[in-house]
């Protein structure tokens, strides 16, 4: 009894200490909301459904506010007119490295000496643009053709059933892996292509197990069983992507060669290089499959949109100088001449891309808002932008923002629509699936080309149908807010076959 009383007294004293040290709002700071639970604050609400929670907070406090989340003070900014003041701020004031390094170490067990994301991006940029982008695009088309049509041919004639997310994710990740990390042999033979399909399928299925547990891993909420499984999956991926294994592969990308040289120059061990390569597999391939899933699902659920995209692709084929059966790549000028498909992709990403854009506040600073207001931010706090809520789902910017409209990003003359407004002012940032500012996605062009090539191959070479035409669009897996493209709560069954 005495011990119980003592523990109760200690708990009460601890609670009083926490309450006495609770932060108060200073003049010039954003509205402060600490929640009702000391230290935790709104961690449970935020983790359960970030979009719904932040919507409620915006209704309560406006487009900027500070909340307590698991001992951290997070200032949330939801005014897209003011985003540029954040994303282009120098690292000496708002740092985007610290959080990236934290996730790199926590999720992927990667520790790199003297690591600088900015230096790495500057180096990688050269391998993802211009002539190198053309080489990646051509290799991606070849590999998509090999895995998509190779698997379908191997499975035999007739219909084949699988989930649409599995369908999109597996083919895009497998082709992307072969494009960046290399193929079995050159010149390619039927045997080597079969080996590529088997090996890339092994990589995908192992990676997918990691991907499913990633939100729990990032939040430190894995069960004991999950932790054991995660250790096993990571070990398997490290073996599959070890530098020694990759050294035997042919036609490796300039991106891979440059990245491995970068790691070697930093003195990184081969074991740590393998871990870094798993991280890069997720960073380069983890969003394309889910993006293609939503795009294809919206097309399958919207006959008018599907007909418009098919019509555009048929027009491209009609203008081509060779039959589609002999097409070995889609030239960049063709990929850049698909305004309808571009609009469909932009609309699909608007509805489903939900990354967090974060900055660590390095020094006390005054942040200007676009409307003339100014708010003081404290050193040590975190600043969070969530474009999914605004601009992407903002009813002031988009009519019926929850509804898929395939031509939302098209002008009446068929050109790309870029004029969107909020509060009577034209928006610079009206759709932000690729991030912005200093951490804008370098691989955007490669990803867009890959998704468009995949859609082209699917619609031209395959019949693809929903098994249940009346199936509802699935809800989001709410645990994935902040990680890029949302994934569905459950997969959607489809069937496909090679066109006769």
UniProtKB/Swiss-Prot annotation:
Q: What is its EC number?
A: 5.3.99.4, 4.2.1.152
One GO MF term on file is: hydroperoxy icosatetraenoate dehydratase activity
Cell inner membrane as a keyword of this entry, yes or no, is no
Give the location in the cell. Answer: Endoplasmic reticulum membrane
Tissue expression, as annotated, is: Widely expressed; particularly abundant in ovary, heart, skeletal muscle, lung and prostate.
Q: Where are the transmembrane segments?
A: 1-20
Task: Quote the catalytic activity from the record.
Answer: prostaglandin H2 = prostaglandin I2; a hydroperoxyeicosatetraenoate = an oxoeicosatetraenoate + H2O; (15S)-hydroperoxy-(5Z,8Z,11Z,13E)-eicosatetraenoate = 15-oxo-(5Z,8Z,11Z,13E)-eicosatetraenoate + H2O; (15S)-hydroperoxy-(5Z,8Z,11Z,13E)-eicosatetraenoate + AH2 = (15S)-hydroxy-(5Z,8Z,11Z,13E)-eicosatetraenoate + A + H2O
* Xref: InterPro entries: Cyt_P450 (IPR001128), Cyt_P450_CYP7A1-type (IPR024204), Cyt_P450_E_grp-IV (IPR002403), Cyt_P450_sf (IPR036396), PTGIS (IPR027286)
Q: Which residues bind substrate?
A: 106, 112, 287, 358-359, 382
GO BP terms, alphabetized: apoptotic signaling pathway; cellular response to hypoxia; cellular response to interleukin-1; cellular response to interleukin-6; decidualization; embryo implantation; icosanoid metabolic process; negative regulation of inflammatory response
Its required cofactor(s), as named, are: heme
Q: Which keywords does this Swiss-Prot/TrEMBL entry list? A: Endoplasmic reticulum, Fatty acid biosynthesis, Fatty acid metabolism, Heme, Iron, Isomerase, Lipid biosynthesis, Lipid metabolism, Lyase, Membrane, Metal-binding, Prostaglandin biosynthesis, Prostaglandin metabolism, Transmembrane, Transmembrane helix
An example of a Gene Ontology cellular component annotation for this protein is:
endoplasmic reticulum
List, alphabetically, the Pfam families matched. p450 (PF00067)
Q: Which residues bind heme?
A: 441
Q: How does it sit in the membrane?
A: Single-pass membrane protein
Q: What family does the Swiss-Prot or TrEMBL record give for this protein?
A: Belongs to the cytochrome P450 family.
Instruction: Provide the function of this protein.
Output: Catalyzes the biosynthesis and metabolism of eicosanoids. Catalyzes the isomerization of prostaglandin H2 to prostacyclin (= prostaglandin I2), a potent mediator of vasodilation and inhibitor of platelet aggregation. Additionally, displays dehydratase activity, toward hydroperoxyeicosatetraenoates (HPETEs), especially toward (15S)-hydroperoxy-(5Z,8Z,11Z,13E)-eicosatetraenoate (15(S)-HPETE).
Disease named in the record: Essential hypertension: A condition in which blood pressure is consistently higher than normal with no identifiable cause.
Q: What is this protein called?
A: Prostacyclin synthase
Give the species this sequence originates from: Homo sapiens
Provide the gene name from the record.
PTGIS
């Amino acid at each position: 009894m005495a011990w119980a009383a003592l523990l109760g007294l200690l708990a009460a004293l601890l609670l009083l200490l926490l309450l006495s040290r609770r932060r108060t709002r200073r003049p010039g700071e954003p509205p402060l909301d600490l929640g009702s639970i000391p230290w935790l604050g709104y961690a449970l609400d935020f983790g359960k459904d970030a979009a719904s929670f932040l919507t409620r907070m915006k209704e309560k406090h406006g487009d900027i506010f500070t909340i307590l989340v698991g001992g951290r003070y997070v200032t949330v900014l939801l005014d897209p007119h003011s985003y540029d003041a954040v994303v282009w701020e120098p690292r000496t004031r708002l740092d985007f490295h610290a959080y990236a390094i934290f996730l790199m170490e926590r999720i992927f067990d990667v520790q790199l000496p003297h690591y600088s994301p900015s230096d790495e991006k500057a180096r990688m940029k050269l391998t993802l643009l211009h002539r190198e982008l053309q080489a990646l695009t051509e290799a991606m088309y070849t590999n998509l053709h090999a895995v998509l049509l190779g698997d379908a041919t191997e499975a035999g004639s007739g219909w084949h059933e699988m989930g649409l997310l599995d369908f999109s994710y597996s083919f895009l990740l497998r082709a992307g892996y072969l494009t960046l990390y290399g193929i079995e042999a050159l010149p390619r033979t039927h045997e080597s292509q079969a080996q590529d399909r088997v090996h890339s399928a092994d990589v995908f299925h192992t990676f997918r197990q990691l991907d499913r547990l990633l939100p729990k891993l990032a939040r430190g909420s894995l069960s004991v069983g999950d932790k054991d499984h995660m250790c096993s999956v990571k070990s398997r991926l490290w073996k599959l992507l070890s530098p020694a294994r990759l050294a035997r592969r042919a036609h490796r990308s300039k991106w891979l060669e440059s990245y491995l040289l970068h790691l070697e120059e930093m003195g990184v061990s081969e074991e740590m290089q393998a871990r870094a390569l798993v991280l890069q597999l997720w960073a380069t391939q983890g969003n394309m499959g889910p993006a293609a899933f939503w795009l294809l699902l919206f097309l399958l659920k919207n006959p008018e949109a599907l007909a418009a995209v098919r019509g555009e692709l048929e027009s491209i084929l009609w203008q081509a100088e060779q039959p589609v059966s002999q097409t070995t790549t889609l030239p960049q000028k063709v990929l850049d001449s698909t305004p309808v498909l571009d609009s469909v992709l932009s609309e699909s990403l608007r509805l489903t891309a939900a990354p967090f854009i974060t900055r660590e506040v390095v020094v006390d600073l005054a942040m200007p808002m676009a409307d003339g207001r100014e708010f003081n931010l404290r050193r040590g706090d975190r600043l969070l932008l969530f474009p999914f809520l605004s601009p992407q789902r903002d009813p002031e910017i988009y009519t019926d923002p929850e509804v898929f409209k395939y031509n939302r990003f098209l002008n009446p003359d068929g050109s790309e629509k870029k004029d969107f407004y909020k509060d009577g002012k034209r928006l610079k940032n009206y759709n932000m699936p690729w991030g912005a500012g200093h951490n804008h996605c370098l691989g955007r062009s490669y990803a867009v080309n890959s998704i468009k090539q995949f859609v082209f191959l699917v619609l031209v070479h395959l019949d693809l149908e929903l098994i249940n035409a009346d199936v509802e669009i699935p809800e989001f897996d709410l645990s994935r807010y902040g990680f890029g493209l949302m994934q569905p709560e459950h997969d959607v069954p489809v069937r496909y076959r090679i066109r006769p």
